[in-house]
């Protein structure tokens, strides 16, 4: 009987039944299924009475809302949670591509959040350590990084005191411009070193110290994807990723090569600006050094024209090469090759003069004899004095007395002069010059 009434009024009977059941309050711990037959009859009578009252109620009357009444609409059933991870922890497609990396394809759905690292990058210990990024995640590149935040918890302290406060690893800043990529990649490499991944960073020869694992490669890809948006990457980085969007190691290797190239460029510019040459080294070696520096700078995009190169070279010349500054300063179209021709000419002249000089040592007596004789370059007449004259010289009055006595004697001739103790001065007179006796 009751079942027929419930079938005739399914909605009303369902609501009435729920209202009667939910309005009851159970004050005991008795099992609700353990009910006697008399109790069941009482419930049936109460239900029949409630149904009769519902039939007399007008359809247009408003029924007050009872919070204990069940909703007549079907309840929404939550979708099943498939897999070992809860639904709220799974990453959506937008979360998987936080930086708009459509250029790199579809990254894998990692089960952990982008700001959480695997425990394999930390010192071993009985407790899993998951470093979490502080509130400075995503700061611009100009934000300074504190030194205190770039360290890890020591393994010994982690084993001894597991309740100590963990130190966080500051993540790299967000890349905001292609021009900032060289500076950004330095902070990213520092971030990998602080994450105990310094062994996978490529060295000078382009190879890492140790092989990289698949988990580490995934970590590189995910962190590079998060902090380096594709729209701010340089063209050469996009070219690498267009071939393999996971080849982050090649990007790091090329970045390190560019860092070394930039350092070499700075060294070449400093060397070229501080050139010094005085002929102490061969001119060929000096020319090779300068031309190699200029060629490297030109190949790296720093063009050094002939005018600037010649000015830098001439500014460093000294010694006998210094006059090249003044002989060539008016030549506007002078090339580096022409300047080195002049340098080679001076260097060869220096070497020739050094080879022509005698290498033996002169005797002191030769130097003494040379000091006593000299050649008069203004007059063709050469005067040679007798070295014994200084030892046997007489006074002027004695010589005059000898001359007067020789003139008074009848047998005086030119032979008497030759027999005198004082020898006359021998002159090589080519111009028929006569000297008075008083002059000698």
From Swiss-Prot:
GO terms for biological process: viral translational frameshifting. Keywords: Cytoplasm, Phosphoprotein, RNA-binding, Transposable element. One of its GO terms (cellular component) is cytoplasm. Retrotransposons are mobile genetic entities that are able to replicate via an RNA intermediate and a reverse transcription step. In contrast to retroviruses, retrotransposons are non-infectious, lack an envelope and remain intracellular. Ty1 retrotransposons belong to the copia elements (pseudoviridae). One of its GO terms (molecular function) is RNA binding. Its main location: cytoplasm. Residues 299-401 are annotated as: RNA-binding. It is found in: Cytoplasm. The modification Phosphoserine is found at residue 416. The C-terminal RNA-binding region of CA is sufficient for all its nucleocapsid-like chaperone activities. The record marks 401-402 as: Cleavage. Homotrimer. Capsid protein (CA) is the structural component of the virus-like particle (VLP), forming the shell that encapsulates the retrotransposons dimeric RNA genome. The particles are assembled from trimer-clustered units and there are holes in the capsid shells that allow for the diffusion of macromolecules. CA also has nucleocapsid-like chaperone activity, promoting primer tRNA(i)-Met annealing to the multipartite primer-binding site (PBS), dimerization of Ty1 RNA and initiation of reverse transcription. Residues 429-440 have a biased composition (Basic and acidic residues). Residues 1-93, 126-173, 352-440 are annotated as: Disordered. Induction: Ty1-OR is a weakly expressed element. Induced under amino acid starvation conditions by GCN4. This is Transposon Ty1-OR Gag polyprotein. It comes from the Eukaryota. Residues 1-10, 48-60, 127-152, 419-428 have a biased composition (Polar residues). Residues 153-165, 402-418 have a biased composition (Low complexity).
